[in-house]
Amino acid sequence: LGTTTVECKSGYGLNKESELKSLKVIDEVNQSHDIDLIATFMGAHAFPPEFKDKHADYVDLICDDMIPEVEKQGIAIFNDVFCENGYFTLEQTRRILNTGRKHGLVPRIHADEFEDSGAAELAGETNSISADHLMAVSEKGIQAMIENNVIATLLPGTTFFLGKSTYAPYKKFKKAGVDVALATDY
């Protein structure tokens, strides 16, 4: 059977035009072969240089302009945010995910990759379909994921690629009853 489905994300242009272009390309390529491509809008992957000191303005752009246009064009299923200290805060992430949900996008979170930021707990609070990475997830985060059926998406290749030694606690997730998915991050 092999690979049947691949998730593809935007999040590398970090402006409206580039984000929409990435999602349109995913949609067009999806029409041309048998592997299902699932598009995820990830305008909240990082802050572009022009918003270095204007984070609130970039979050406004995502919520007030990008997400409504993604919905209008019907070019994504999921909405993902990189919720981590130094990136998007819990409050910014909550706003972006709730806005996405109002526009028909299913929430997901890049959570607790470098330290426990409370993002796994937020994944539970926002009823996200999944929380990705989770190398520094807390017990409270695991509990919130259990209570809200959040899938733990583990990406061991990221740990290896970054030269880190800490992997997501697979055995804790399985013992706790959290559904686990494995992904490559590529």
Model regions and ranges:
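Metal-coordinating catalytic core of metallo-dependent amide/deamination hydrolases
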Residues: 4-117
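Active-site-adjacent C-terminal substructures of enzyme catalytic domains
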Residues: 106, 116-186
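Short intrinsically disordered, low-complexity coil segments enriched in acidic
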Residues: 1-6, 127
